[in-house]
Structures are given as C-alpha cells and as structure tokens.
C-alpha cells in the first residue's frame, strides 16, 4: 500500500483546525491499514516527526503520497505545494499556482469573472490607505453597496469575516482587521441563502463529480456563517439543501466551473449565496476542512462515501495523477 505522510498544524491562524483535520485523516489511515507518518508543522514553520525537528527532505523520505491537512497560509497558499513539487512527491489537493489563486479571494474572483458567474461587488482595501479612511468610507458604500461584508483578502474558516451594516461599523472593523491583515476585501452583502458545493475528481466514472449542495443556516437568524459557527455544532447544515431544481443545477454547474477554471485537483469546495433564483459565487477552497464537523465529508457521506473511503480515494487519485 501507499506510504502516506500527513501534514498538519502550520504557522497560520488555522493551526487548531488543521490539527483536527489531520487527526481525522490519521484515524482513517489506521482503519485502512495505510503505512503512515504524522508530520506536525509548528507555528514557527518547523517540521516535526515523532517530536523531532526534521528537514522536509528527511521527513519525506520513503513517502509515496503526502496528505495535506493544512489550512490557511503556508498550507493553502501554494507554499507547501511548491516544496512538494520541487521534491517530486505526490500530494493531495491542488498544485501551487492554483492554490495561490484560490487563496487570494480577489484574484480568484478576477480569474472567474470572464466565465459569466455572478459575484458580489467588491473593493480591496490596503493597510496603506488607513490615513485617508474617513474620506474613503462614504465612497466604499457608494461603490460597493448599502450593506457590506468584510474579510481578510487571504484567509480561511471565515476568520476575521464580519457583516457591516453602517459606516461606523465599517471604520471600526477596517481598523481592527488592517491591524492584523495587510489587505481586506469589502464586499456587497447579499441577503440570501448560503450554499456550499464540493467537487471531486475521478469518482464514479466522472472526471469531475459534483457532490450534493449543502444549505447552511447560521444559528439564531444571524447573517453569516462565522468561524465560531463552523465548529460549535450550532449551525444547521442541510444535505441536500432546500433549493429549487434550477438553483441546484446552477450551483452544481458553478462549482464544477470554478474547479476547472482555477485548475483545482482532486477536490475543492465553493461557497455561494442564492437570492431570487440567482447564484452568486463567493470563493473557492482548495483544501476543504476534514474535521468531524466539516462540510465536505458530510456531502460525501450523502452519496454513500464514508470518511475512510473518502480519504483513500483522495490518496489514490493523488498518487496516480502526480506520478
């Protein structure tokens, strides 16, 4: 059987989520009898194997496939993918360039724009614009919309994301986010139903297989699927989502299109808002979460693919496609 190294942890804010994803993957590998090793990347970026610091070259010795269970910067932005590509080691998920495009939310939008998908209007704000923030805030509302949503330009798990109903909240939120992040994305807030759609390669004789649409309902009527809601078990996630036939068809087609245009490999998950029968593309994730609370495994389970078999499938297609 393939010898698998699981990469988890990492220097991003999503260290804890990555550790959970990696732990779930390791459990699946034990159940499938894959020979494996657990490589934890510390918050400082050191690679640890059995508690000892190793160079990537040493840690990857005698490995057939790397399962990337990292999230956020370093894991999803193409950095670790570049390391693995240089070493010639097969790995799960998209290659470095596609990962970098998807991780930068504006770059992903601009890549998708010529392909006809609807998207919320947006504007990127850089930290160096802080000195003229007061004069720019009214312009932001005029350009983007009366109600806004802001998030870091490059991040995952909804970290830092928030709903902005007015100018006072926008200024406060921008000051807070730009203190941590160099750039943020200000988007038009579209009130509608949240949906997410997973895509997988080479499953059931389909080169691009679209999983059932998931409808996401945040608790207590809140306006967004926050980082806290993703992992506290309070959000209602309905598989398949309660969308019309035409809405589901649009969502599935849009997710498959994003997967192809960004040149994702093995698996991805795209997020959308549905309003009045129209589908708005928000972003694409090249390394969807794989914890017990994560959406991608739930969608796979809805078509009869259990977690252990999902992990095995990703390993096998990674080994074949990257040889």
Where are these regions (language model features)?
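Short beta-strand-to-turn element immediately C-terminal to the catalytic PLP-Schiff-base lysine
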Residues: 125, 161-166, 199-202, 275, ...
């Amino acid at each position: 059987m393939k010898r698998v190294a699981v990469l988890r942890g990492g220097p991003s804010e999503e260290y804890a989520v990555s550790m959970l994803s990696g732990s779930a993957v390791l459990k699946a590998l034990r159940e499938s009898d894959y020979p494996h090793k657990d490589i934890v990347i510390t918050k400082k970026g050191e690679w640890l194997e059995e508690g000892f610091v190793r160079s990537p070259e040493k840690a990857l010795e005698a490995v057939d496939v790397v399962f990337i269970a990292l999230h956020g910067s370093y894991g999803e932005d193409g950095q670790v993918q570049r390391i693995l590509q240089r070493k010639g080691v097969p790995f799960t998920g998209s290659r470095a360039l596609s990962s970098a495009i998807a991780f930068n939310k504006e770059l992903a939008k601009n890549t998708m724009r010529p392909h006809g998908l609807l998207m919320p209007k947006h504007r990127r704000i850089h930290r160096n614009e802080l000195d003229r923030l007061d004069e720019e805030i009214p312009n932001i509302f005029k350009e983007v919309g009366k109600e806004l949503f802001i998030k870091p330009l490059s991040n995952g798990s909804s970290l830092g994301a928030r709903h902005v109903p007015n100018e006072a909240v926008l200024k406060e939120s921008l000051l807070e986010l730009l203190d941590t992040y160099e750039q943020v994305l200000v988007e038009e807030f579209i009130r509608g139903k949240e949906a997410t759609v997973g895509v997988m390669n080479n499953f059931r004789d389909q080169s691009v297989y679209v999983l059932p649409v998931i409808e996401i309902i945040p608790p207590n009527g809140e306006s967004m699927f926050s980082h806290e809601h993703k992992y506290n078990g309070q959000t209602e996630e309905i598989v398949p989502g309660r969308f019309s036939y035409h809405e589901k068809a649009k969502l599935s087609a849009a997710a498959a299109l994003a997967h192809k245009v960004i040149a994702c490999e093995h698996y991805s998950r795209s997020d959308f808002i549905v309003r009045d029968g129209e589908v708005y593309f928000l972003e694409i994730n090249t390394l969807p979460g794989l914890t017990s609370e994560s959406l991608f495994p739930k969608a796979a389970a809805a078509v009869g693919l259990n977690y252990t078999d999902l992990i095995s499938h990703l390993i096998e297609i990674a080994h074949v496609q990257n040889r």
